[in-house]
Amino acid sequence: MRLGAALQAAALLTASLWSHPLLAASDDPAFKTTKLDHYPFNLNYFEDSDIVLYQDEARGTISRSEDAGATWTLVKDIEEGKAFQLVMHPFDRKRAYVLTSPGIHHFRTHDQGRTWQDFLADTEMTMFRLDILSFHATDPDRIIFNGMDCKEGKFFCEEVAMYTTDGFTSDAKFLRGSTSGCSWAKSSKLFTTGQDDLDKNRILCVVRDHFSPLKQDQRLMISDNFFSAKDAGGVIQEFEPNLDMTRPIQGVVNVAVVKKYLLVAASSMNTDEMSLFVSDDTLKWHRAMFPTDHKINQESYTVLESTEYSIQVDVMTTHPSNPMGVMYTSNSNGTFFTRNIEHTNRNHRGHVDFEKITGVQGIFMVNKVDNAEEVEKDRRGKKKIVSEITFDDGRTFEPIHADKERLHLHSVTELINAGRVFSSPAPGLVMGNGNTGKHLESWKDASLYISDDAGLTWIKGPNGPHKYEFGDQGSVLLAVMQAEEVDEVKYSLNHGKDWKTAKLPDDLKVKPIILTTTQDSTSLKFILIGEGKGRDEFHIVAIDFSSMHEATCKDSDMEDWYARVDDKGKATCLMGHTQKYRRRKKDADCFVKQEFKDPVPETKDCECSDQDFECDYNFKRDGKECVLVGTVVAPDGACKNAGPDDTFKGSSGWRLIPGNTCKRASGAQKDDLVDRKCKETSEPTPSEPSGNISTTPHNFSGDWLDFEKHYLEKGAESMDENEVVIARPINAQNAGQIFLTKDHGKTWHMPEALKDKNIWGIVTHQYFKEMAFFVQDTGSVIYTVDHGEHFHDFKAPGNGIDPDTKPLVFHPDHKDWMIWIGKKCEENTCYREASFSQDRGDNWKSIARYVYKCEFTGSSSYKFRSQDQIICSIQSREGNEKNIPFDLVSSNDLFKTSEVRQKNIKDFATMAEFIVVAAEDPERKSLKAFASLDGDSYAATRFPSNLDVKEERAFTILDSSTHAVKLFVPSPAQKDRCVGSIAKSNSNGTDYVVSITGVNCDENYFVDFEKMLTLEGVILVNIVANRENTNEPKKRRSLISHSDGATWSYLPPPRVDAEGKNYPCTSSDNGDENCALHIHGYTERKDHGKTYSSAGAVGLMFGVGNVGSTLGDIKDADTFLTTDAGISWKSVKKGAWRWAYGDQGSILMLVPSTKTKMVSYTTDEGETWNDHNFTDEPVDVLDMTTVSSGGSRNFLLWCRRSDKTVFAVNLDLTGLANTACKQVDDNDSESDYYAWSPSHPLRPDDCLFGHKSYYLRKKTDRKCYNKHKITPVFKMDVCECTREDFECDYNYELEGVGRNCVLAKGAQPMSREDWCSAHPKESTWYEPSGFRRIPISTCKEGRVFDNYTTSWPCPGHEEEYERQHGGPGGFTIFLIVILCVGAAGAVGVWVHRRWESGGFGQIRLGEQSSSGISFLDPDSPWVRYPVVAVSATVALVGALPLLVGALWRTTKTTVERWGIFGGVGRGTYGSLGLGGGSGARRFTTRDSFARGRSDYAGIDEDEGELLGDDSDEEV
């Protein structure tokens, strides 16, 4: 720090004004003020002391006071500009920490801030969570530091955890990588595991899935030895607890300690419904069970300040713009929750008007909405809020009164001060701002009210709203008016009966911000922080009452005060005892003067009563009884070798609440053991399954051609058994009524809210699948957020829909955030306007005029991007003239501000982590592509010399889920001869290599390209074999890649067809150009919403095609199946059949494409097939659908009879099995699952992308069903590097269909200057080998193809290069070894996660599809060409195969496939890998290479999107 700056700061901090000298027995408190230039953030007392710290955020400094704020000094041990965050140790009154950012060195004090020492955390503090430090409750030296390692600045950051056991006296040690927050189990003094060694060492970490950045894939891991290797094999000691009794749960998003409870919150894909799990020892866990009419959703529940014997939670039950809730209280183990009070008042931040009275058990105050029904009907209606209090822990509530009038108090939702709202440790003293009357009035009309009997009775204090504090155990009440200019404080020395005023010194006037004192309210000193008149003027006012009275209270000045009394003033019992405090009498003329000594209650046990008992484990209260909801826990040895009707002494259903101290009376007790039958100790044995398929048809009246249908899906961990589908019959001109089913089509009804409504389009939320929006052309929208249980509505801004654009855009994390793009008309002109809402349509703000489209590009998966980022394409100037160019405009603050990023663009699309923009190149009259990761900076793409893009007019963006953009570049084409190349980018989307040429496409630039769902890097394409012979019809062949497009091979043909007959041609095992299996691709698909594979059926894939030298006519095609991800295929049916996957792949269903009355299904992966008739006469099956995850055992057939009537048939296969499959990890024969590993056809070791992954699949001979979602990746082993882990580098290409990469004809390898310029932070360039590592490969050692050549220094990095590559010095050798290991180990893993998905890749094949109405008419431009033209010369097709993304989205309608609704260009989340690229990773810290940390943060996966031209339409 500069000396001058230090002196100025010191002078400023010590420039203070005394108002009154400290004289004995003064009539008023003493004041001392300090003037500041910046607000004193984060002001904190060291507990039980007058020592205070605050931080100056503007200067990055810490200041300290030893006299309760009277004087201040600057902490000189911390250099100016370093202090970023001040953290107090919650369990040690002498320790505090100052964190720096950026930086890996931080500061600590162990002597209340007198001295500070720096410590090495070896990582930066994480920017992704607030709880940087996690403290051990009983050992202050044990601290966990949640940090992050970053690559390329803060572009790709991964969270890591460090720890110390000596209070950072020595450097922090590495705990675990790939974390999302770690904490000690013993994070609360009340919590215990029951074992001293576990209390000391046990750590819980939320761990990011190795393959995914999705919060829905995070898991909870526990370790008792700091996640260290427990043996020489390097296996980390950690285990995953069974959160749901018998099985682990994925999707863990938060862990919190509440008193003696440990709470874990988990989320699932497709929904914002949450699951809560509770433990009081980390050993036994329970799912928190709420009444069935209320679910726990993200951002809709608040864990309140709970007790030592129960958890209290408030759950929002209404619309977020005007929220209300219901408060629940659990039993003592946190399992079952019962309703306390309805219509609690909440705000949109999740704050609830609830507060317990400090130090008194069983008393808390709440505000509720008195006109709840009115507010529910009118979301803009004004709440009429009333205050109530309970004295029996929420069993009953009663009004609050002052002067015989009802009193209402402003509470937590209107916080105006630090700390608690009403009470403090001062026994029985409570204050609040409010008013008397029928309900709570506005804040400005409030006055101060006081109670000295814990809220039973109240008196009025000073008029107007005030900040207030308690001192000297309640002897002093201090208040300051909440106003713009205040020059006095008010105080009372007799519990608020009388008030005096004291002027601030030197005519000082401030706007009060904070009034505070010590945590225990035992001090006579207070601190007031206020804002002065001038700009950047703040004041700290120290207020001292210690000189006002000489007398110290004697015993005669004290009284006994009972915390809870009944109407007659008699002490009442709670938790088996009464509670009494010794406190100063109201009118005593003395101070207690027991600083830093907390009041301690006296208790007296009561005789036990019914309220001292609760329902026992596996029992639930039903009125006045406890009923069994599970199995009875039998004592050890009971029922061993006994019959089901034999008895034992077991629980009565009741137990004494743990911690209850009541005295038992003589005689029978409520929890006495009773006779129980042994059959009650186990679940009833299920009866034998029927083995039958249930068929339930439903007729839709009228003449129709097809159906529009949408699945409203649920989360994987949802307890809801319903399967909801919305459908309506349609024809070319109109649509019928909307129907809804909750049982997958067995019964249907018309929702009253939608009956006879003219619905233009149905839009399902692509991220939160329980939501659907029913859009009318006027802009009125009806919607449901709970699978059709309830319906709401809003009016969109503007003048209705624009039929040429999708009206709604959704945010991936916030279900209430929406963008509406509609028509806005002013005078004689109309244009598109984009408006934004944060409360699901209640309020709108215009963000852009003359807009083409907008997308939310911010997401929790993109840690390198602003979460509030929106990108829009907007006309460069307003007006309706043709050919006005568009600009790419982005905003990182929800369009409070915005900036033009690219000019003259045609369109943009998002794909995985990439944003790709197509802009017009006016010189070449063609398109030019740009790519961005952060949405702010865009780099031009560079294509290899063997790819001609000089006159490019269209690009199709294919699946890009593996840290690389896959771009289809069409070749100059003749009519019906569209072919092109697939180019694959590097990890930042800028440098491309050719993956494969001659790929088939159609005139709309849709491509025969298919990704296999769930598995990484398995791709199918169709190429045109005779592309040089332009006069011949196309001869197409199918190729498959198991290396993400690095190498290709033919599909191996089966030997015999479905009838056992030999095929006419034979080939090698892997197929060749003369004989192979060929599959009809995306360009021939009538329904672009169908996929070959399913997210839930790993390794399984169907296809329709033929065996031969080329692909034949589809009329001659048969149906084929692979169960090993394309390594081998078998013919399962003659002819072309449709397929669907059920029960996560254990049920496969087929139906003929011709008229039929039967379906065929298999439960053994196609070894045997069974037929089932679903109707009496052959009908046209328009479609067969099920849930997108493939996890249901119900299917729907959508059919049309010859008389043009339509109907749907539910096929229920639950009768095939009624026992849930079980996984037994250590007993393969007992387990119903086996570990299946995909393999590479060219590798004998089953390695793919540098590792061998094992997936759980149900054994085909087991008669059970998959009750729960199967663990996606069971385990993974890392492999050595081989050729299959590398692909051709920039300007190199495969030599034929071979394995060698050669320089493209006429091309030059990338020069050292070009490579170093593209990688400015790298020091070393290797002469090109022709190869580069596949970004998702995790291989280590072995044969390294990309950097075995000669190395050279990058310009400007010569010294660094010499240090790395210089002579044989020990340190240099050490660096070389480290860099080599870092380059080999820090490589990307990308396993695409699609368990709740409907599609992945440019070809979106889900298990459902739909048709639409007018905009779905075959003559409609939406169907004819899913494009948007932008100019006559150079245009860019805008909408395209990019549907609603990959991962957890299902394929909905063809409309969605084109992106008319629900997220063109905006994907869902993808998976997290360990880095990529051929260069060595440059880590933030010196030992990061040893940690196994990832290089990539959130990655988004999406489907293909077409960027091209079309001259048929204009904008």
Swiss-Prot record:
List where the protein spans the membrane. Answer: 1371-1391, 1427-1447
Main location as per UniProt: Golgi
Tell me its family. Answer: Belongs to the VPS10-related sortilin family.
- Descriptive protein name: Vacuolar protein sorting/targeting protein 10
Keyword Membrane set for record = yes
Q: Which GO terms describe its biological process?
A: Golgi to endosome transport; Golgi to vacuole transport; protein targeting to vacuole
Gene that specifies this protein: VPS10
- Gene Ontology annotations for the cellular component aspect, listed alphabetically: cytosol; Golgi apparatus; membrane
Q: Which organism is it from?
A: Pyricularia oryzae (strain 70-15 / ATCC MYA-4617 / FGSC 8958) (Rice blast fungus)
- What does it do? Functions as a sorting receptor in the Golgi compartment required for the intracellular sorting and delivery of soluble vacuolar proteins, like carboxypeptidase Y (CPY) and proteinase A. Executes multiple rounds of sorting by cycling between the late Golgi and a prevacuolar endosome-like compartment.
The UniProt entry, under InterPro entries, shows:
Sortilin_C, Sortilin_N, VPS10, VPS10-sortilin, WD40/YVTN_repeat-like_dom_sf
Cytoplasmic topological domain ranges are: 1392-1426
